Amino acid sequence: MERYETLFAQLKNRQEGAFVPFVTLGDPGPEQSLKIIDALIEGGADALELGIPFSDPLADGPTIQGAALRAFAAGVTPAQCFEMLAAIRQKHPTIPIGLLMYANLVFSPGIDAFYAQCARVGVDSVLVADVPVEESAPFRQAAMRHNIAPIFICPPNADDDLLRQIASYGRGYTYLLSRAGVTGAENRAALPLHHLVEKLAEYHAAPPLQGFGISAPEQVSAAIDAGAAGAISGSAIVKIIERHLDEPQTMLDELKAFVQSLKAATKTA
């Protein structure tokens, strides 16, 4: 959890926002997936947001669902994902690693056992996409016991009560939704976030990162101009993987270049 605090302090000193890519672990196969993570980090990723493939992803658009299906086709299991996480952590000791996942994958080993496993492999945060704040007590309590940051989604229409809860229970960062709906680069982000960002700051919430529909450098700049601490991009990155399944090296080069361009947009100095 402390890796996020360290990162945000360093970025503040450098007058930069955070750029955080999302990919599904094991897409398109375990070996290439680890190379993808390396390419994202070489491109300048400040933190990682990683999905564990799940058969029924409610909040995901077709792009991210496709990533999960490719990982399944390659035989990737949650146990294998944890082995990959341990390998990523060993190779990259300082980068914050977040998981974005669904409750069934947490229930399956048992809530406490799941967070204990996260702590063992060096995961810093967990966002459980289908658990609303008001039902989050068992998850966030287990997370805190194991020094894992519980991450909450702040929707664009959040009322004051919800903002206070998110600020009170969340750690690490706050996932600021650009808009309601499923993920995807097609629906470009276009909501004024100043109000939410100001309220979250007033309630001392963890730094907000804007996600959903981030696919171009100007959207990253706009998120930071609105007061967000950075931006998360998922579908646009997974589309690069999808486009180059037959050209693994081109895929890695394109991913690195894409991250470099969006990371460059976080530099405000």
UniProtKB/Swiss-Prot annotation:
- Enzyme Commission number, as recorded: 4.2.1.20
The entry's cellular-component GO terms read: cytosol
The family database entries (SUPFAM superfamilies) matched by this protein are listed as: Ribulose-phoshate binding barrel (SSF51366)
Pathway(s) served: Amino-acid biosynthesis; L-tryptophan biosynthesis; L-tryptophan from chorismate: step 5/5
Which top-level group of life is the source organism from? Bacteria
Residue numbers annotated as active site: 49 (proton acceptor), 60 (proton acceptor)
Q: Give the InterPro entries listed for this entry.
A: Aldolase_TIM, RibuloseP-bd_barrel, Trp_synthase_alpha_AS, Trp_synthase_suA
Sorted UniProt keywords: Amino-acid biosynthesis, Aromatic amino acid biosynthesis, Lyase, Tryptophan biosynthesis
Any single GO molecular-function term of the entry would be: tryptophan synthase activity
So what does this thing catalyse? (1S,2R)-1-C-(indol-3-yl)glycerol 3-phosphate + L-serine = D-glyceraldehyde 3-phosphate + L-tryptophan + H2O
What Pfam families does its record include? Trp_syntA
Protein family: Belongs to the TrpA family.
Query: Briefly, what is this protein's role?
Result: The alpha subunit is responsible for the aldol cleavage of indoleglycerol phosphate to indole and glyceraldehyde 3-phosphate.
Its quaternary structure?
Answer: Tetramer of two alpha and two beta chains.
Q: Which HAMAP family match?
A: Trp_synth_alpha
Protein name listed in UniProt: Tryptophan synthase alpha chain
What organism is the protein native to?
Answer: Klebsiella aerogenes (Enterobacter aerogenes)
Provide the taxonomic classification. Bacteria, Pseudomonadati, Pseudomonadota, Gammaproteobacteria, Enterobacterales
Gene (name only):
trpA
